Amino acid sequence: MWLYLVALVGLWTLLRFFRERQVVSHLQDKYVFITGCDSGFGNLLARQLDRRGMRVLAACLTEKGAEQLRNKTSDRLETVILDVTKTESIVAATQWVKERVGNRGLWGLVNNAGICVFAINEWLKKEDFANILDVNLLGMIEVTLSMLPLVRKARGRVVNISSSMGRVSLCGGGYCISKYGVEAFSDSLRREISYFGVKVAIIEPGGFRTNVSNYERLSHSIEKLWDQTSSEVKEVYDKNFLDSYIKAIQSLTDTCSDDLSVVTDCMEHALTACHPRTRYSAGWDAKLFYLPLSYMPTFLVDAMLYWSSVKPAQAL
């Protein structure tokens, strides 16, 4: 019995291995639009796909970021300025893409732009949550809906960058909320547009060293949020908690990997494979920590986080 089971698992693994290595033909004729290309995953993916001969349309937030990217790539790659929080910017970028892809349509849309704030929910105001959701979720949704007719024409791919924290909410501050939203939107979109031959993939990176996970920026944002809280909240948590919380964030960022290609290789596979995965867990922590944690009973996860987390001054 066990021998048959092992044989079946081995056969399934072998079939999956060969199936996932089938590559889409004529990649050099296919256009891919990527948001958030100033730095990090988007920047590396743009250069990676350009080296592969694909037609990369890279959206950057700043002209400086766009210029630096163009200097590192071939003449095939084109850039456009895009602020995903502004409708007029999205409309202009969509028209720009439409003029370039023509009747071929857009093969790949990669929603990569994002920001991050880790903090206690009680320290935030409504607008603090809104700022994160505008970029990470609502901006992504608006870009997708705007570009979708072009992707449908090419029977292409939508690749949305979520996070391992879109599976397990380890902290407050709006980031996890936005990534849970990315997961839900991507799942519903995948089912809706599968009828048109369009595939949707979700990338769930673990900890990687990018501008989003920069310790100095994160600690500064935490201190800024602490300063705006009421005296009552500060008394409940106290300054020692703040210091310990920031140290915990530093410990988390110190474990981040420098090898961004682990993530961009997943993104590239989602765009170029004949049979892309629905979800990609990128990184050892994503596979060995966050993914198993997401399947554990809630009470067990809560207990683990309770005993391992920093405690407020007035904790019971």
UniProtKB/Swiss-Prot annotation:
Pfam families: adh_short. NADP(+) binds at residues 33-57. Coiled coil: none annotated. It is an enzyme of class 1 (oxidoreductase). Its EC number is 1.1.1.105. One of its GO terms (biological process) is retinol metabolic process. One of its GO terms (cellular component) is endoplasmic reticulum. Substrate binds at S163. The active site is at Y175. Belongs to the short-chain dehydrogenases/reductases (SDR) family. Acts on androgens and retinols, i.e. has steroid 3-alpha- and 17-beta-dehydrogenase and cis/trans-retinol catalytic activities. This is Retinol dehydrogenase 7.
